[in-house]
Structures are given as C-alpha cells and as structure tokens.
Regions:
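A surface-exposed partner-binding patch
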Residues: 1-108, 172-184
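Residue-level signal for alpha-helical context at structural boundaries
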Residues: 28, 66, 70, 118, ...
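Intrinsic-disorder-associated interaction segments
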Residues: 37, 44, 125, 129-133, ...
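Extended hydrophobic/aromatic-rich secondary-structure runs
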Residues: 59-62, 77-81, 142, 151-154, ...
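Residues in well-ordered beta-strands of folded domains
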Residues: 101, 119-121
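Short acidic-glycine loop/turn motifs at beta-strand connectors
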Residues: 112-115
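Compact, glycine/acidic-enriched structural inserts
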Residues: 121-152
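Acidic, proline/glycine-rich low-complexity IDRs
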Residues: 148-184
C-alpha cells in the first residue's frame, strides 16, 4: 500500500474503534497545501500534504474527548494551528522538521522534509529528537499494525489507549533499523 492507502486504512480503523472520528477531523480546506507552504515553505513532506488534503485536523476544543487523539496521547493539529506548531518546533530543531502530531504541551511527532524520517521530540530542557521510523510509509504501516494487532484499544472512558510493550514489538518488526525501538 502507498501512503494515501495506508492513511485511509488508518482512518477507517480509527473510525471502527471510535465512531465519529473521521467527521471530528473536519473536511479539508480547499487551500490546505498553500497554507502549509505559506507557513513552512517547500518542499512539504508528502505525508503532511496527504493528511491535510483529507482532513483539517483536530480542533483545540474538540467536543468529544474520546475523539481527540490521532494516536494515544497525540492529536493531529488543526490546519489553523499548524503554523504556530511549526514555528515552535523550528526554533528548536530547524526548518527541515515539520510537525505531524502534538500532545498539547511539549511533545511532537515530526517528519523531516528532506529525509522523510519520522521522529518524536519533547521541547523541554533536553529537546531531544529520536527517529521512530525511517520514512512515512513505515510510520503509517506501524500505526495500521497497531490497530490490526490490537495494540491500540479504547478504554472504559472511551479514550484511545495502547499496550506499550506490544507497541514496541510491532514497531521493532516494521522498523528493525531504528534504535528507538531497540530500547527495552
């Protein structure tokens, strides 16, 4: 599967676990690519363009708590918020990194516009950035597998949850050359 097909599959799996999730992300804005380019310049990561050509993202004030997370603990920033997220991330890690997901505080998943690597970072006093996938395809394959292999679940409160041990197992299998997943 290509990036678009994997994203569609991930959204379908999210919808099965949390009905209403896709609708909560909103329709894409007609000028989404232009807005991203205006904020971050070019080239844009294809995954970022694919996402925002399908949806507009999770609004900061999402009405249903169970629909906030794209992955456990991280939401897809709404397109209107994305430029501010980019600026905050750029100050620490440079203009090559484009935010994908945000935890609402200092945590980000980001994609490198030059290498297509996906990384996690917390903009705290350490400001580390750790690669979690060598490319967007592996990143999406990992997310899809997390649903298909029951790593992701919905807890009794309707919130997206996950099994941390199983997440590492699945990620190591799909991303065998990434040190982040080799840590126990």
């Amino acid at each position: 599967m290509n990036i678009e097909q994997l994203l569609d599959r991930y959204l379908q799996l999210s919808e099965l676990k949390r009905p209403g999730y896709i609708e909560s992300l909103g329709l894409p804005l007609p000028d989404s690519t232009q807005q991203l380019e205006l904020a971050a310049g070019t080239p844009l990561a294809p995954l970022l363009v694919c996402i925002y050509n399908k949806v507009s993202g999770t609004p900061r004030q999402c009405k249903r708590e169970g629909l906030i997370d794209f992955i456990p603990g991280f939401r897809l920033p709404h397109l209107r918020e994305w430029p501010a997220a980019y600026e905050a991330f750029k100050l620490v890690h440079g203009e090559q990194w484009l935010p994908l997901l945000f935890d609402g505080d200092k945590g980000y998943y980001a994609i490198n516009r030059e290498t297509d690597e996906v990384a996690i970072s917390f903009l705290d006093e350490f400001a580390f950035i750790d690669t979690i996938s060598l490319n967007a395809l592996n990143f999406l394959q990992t997310l899809v597998a997390n649903y298909e292999r029951k790593v992701y679940s919905v807890d009794r409160y309707g919130l997206l949850d996950y099994d941390e041990r199983r997440e590492g197992e699945v990620a190591r299998e799909i991303n065998p050359d990434v040190d982040y997943w080799m840590e126990e």
